[in-house]
Each structure stands twice: as structure tokens, then as C-alpha cells.
Amino acid sequence: MQRLCLSNEQIERLQAIIESKQNCKCQADVSFGTVWITSDDELNELRVSFLGDFELIVSRVGFNHKHRGTMTAVLEELKKICAEVGVPKIVIQSVLTPEMQAFCHAQHIEPDKNTTMQAGEVLVGDYFLMLDS
């Protein structure tokens, strides 16, 4: 298993998307291979990391302004990053809201049958997207 981390350029691309779509200023913190991008007002955040060369994990997402295409643009960038480093899978960890469930469904991101359960109207848990090789 190869240990991967986002490059400074990849982090800057993600940061630029969030700043542009959310009209904010962000900073990125890197710790043990995990990248956490937050806005100065702490209303926007994205946390991503690699699990070796197996998958890229999105473990935290929060954007102040909805329906601006922020997560769609972030997902497209994450797909490019995975292609650059040869990672075949993106995992959206701990989907808890109807909005994120709807986003995953619209983007063909599938619930992991081993880690999801029905909680009211939301199928909570991890969702994954297998990428073309």
C-alpha cells in the first residue's frame, strides 16, 4: 500500500473552488496526510485524505451557501486528483443529511451496503464512487 497525500497544487485547486463558489477566504491545514480546508469565518469546510492508494475519503463537508455547485465542482476536482495519482475510489464518509444523500444519488455515488442503515428518511453511512480506470 502506497501512502499518498494531496500536493500543494491540488490543495490550492480545491481551496480556489471553495473560495470562488462560497465567496470566502480559506486556509488549509495538513496533518498526517489529512487536508482540512476551512474558511476564515469557519462556515465552510472540507476534509479529505487518502487511504493508501485504495481510496480518497471525504470525511467532512459543510458549505454556508447552498445550491451554488460547490460540492459538484469539488467532486469533479477530486475525480481529477484521483486520476492523477491512480486512486480508483472516492468515499463520502458518514452521510447524515437528506441533502448529502440527494447529492450522492444525483452524482451516482452509491451507498455502501456494509456501512449504511436507514434512519428515518435518510440512508446514513458511507457512500462510494468507483472511478473509471
Regions found by a protein language model. Give the residues of each.
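Conserved acetyl-CoA binding element of GNAT-fold acetyltransferases
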Residues: 51-64
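Short amphipathic alpha-helix that is part of the acyltransferase structural core
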Residues: 1-29
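Conserved hydrophobic beta-strand within the GNAT/NAT acetyltransferase core sheet
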Residues: 90-94
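Glycine-rich phosphate/pyrophosphate-binding loop shared by adenosine-nucleotide-utilizing enzymes
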Residues: 39-46, 56
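C-terminal "cap" of GNAT-fold acetyltransferases
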Residues: 116-133
